A protein has these predicted regions:
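Short, small-hydrophobic-rich alpha-helical interface motif
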Residues: 4, 14-25, 122, 133, ...
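Sigma70-family region 2
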Residues: 6, 22-40
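A short pre-motif secondary-structure segment
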Residues: 108-112
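Structural recognition of an alpha-helix C-terminal capping motif at a helix-to-coil junction
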Residues: 16-23, 41-53
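C-terminal edge and immediately downstream basic/flexible tail or linker adjoining helix-turn-helix-like DNA-binding
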Residues: 66-67, 124-127, 141-161
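Internal acidic/polar
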Residues: 64-91
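Arg/Lys-rich amphipathic alpha helix in sigma70-family domain 2
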Residues: 27, 31-33, 48-69, 139
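Short, charged helix-capping/linker segments at alpha-helix termini
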Residues: 1-20, 153-154, 161
């Protein structure tokens, strides 16, 4: 379910992605062929791949509702001081922060950082330009930094009081 949460707008969308993914898995289970000696890891990878591509399909289906304009912006890596509070944040909080991003930003961020897709692969899968992928990733990182900064300020206020 965590994969679905990363790509969904809300819990209902995550459940829809999960259900669609399991339908695909049940329909295609006969095609599964273990790629490695360790069948469990191979099967988990196969399931994960189906869920990710189901989430991409969900994004494409709803793309017209949340397209972001194309901009060619260079992607910059966040500096250490910009993400310094990350170690104070739980996994569930990170997922909630990611869910607060727009669908376009959230999808590109998840595909790039979590799934390891290249910008070229993201552009091909989502039907956007490489520049848009880079721009959306940069904007997603910037928004997450703001969210994290605000969260840290709230935590500091609570600790003082």
């Amino acid at each position: 379910m965590a994969i679905c949460d990363c790509y969904a707008n809300n819990e209902d969308d995550a459940i829809e992605i999960l259900n669609d993914g399991f339908l695909k898995i049940f329909k295609e289970i006969h095609r599964y062929k273990p790629a490695y000696a360790n069948e469990i890891n191979s099967f988990k990878g196969w399931l994960r791949k189906i869920m990710v591509y189901t989430a991409i399909d969900h994004f494409r289906k709803n793309k017209k509702h949340h397209l972001v304009g194309e901009l060619d912006v260079a992607v910059t890596q966040p500096s250490a001081h910009e993400i310094s509070g990350l170690d104070k944040v739980s996994y569930d909080e990170i997922i909630r922060f990611i869910q607060r991003l727009s669908p376009a930003y959230r999808t590109v961020l998840s595909l790039f950082i979590i799934e390891g897709f290249s910008h070229e692969e993201i552009a091909e899968q989502l039907g956007i330009s490489v520049g848009t992928s880079k721009s959306n990733l940069a904007k997603a990182r910037k928004q997450l930094q703001k969210i994290l900064h605000n969260q840290n300020q709230i935590s500091e206020i609570k600790n003082v009081g």
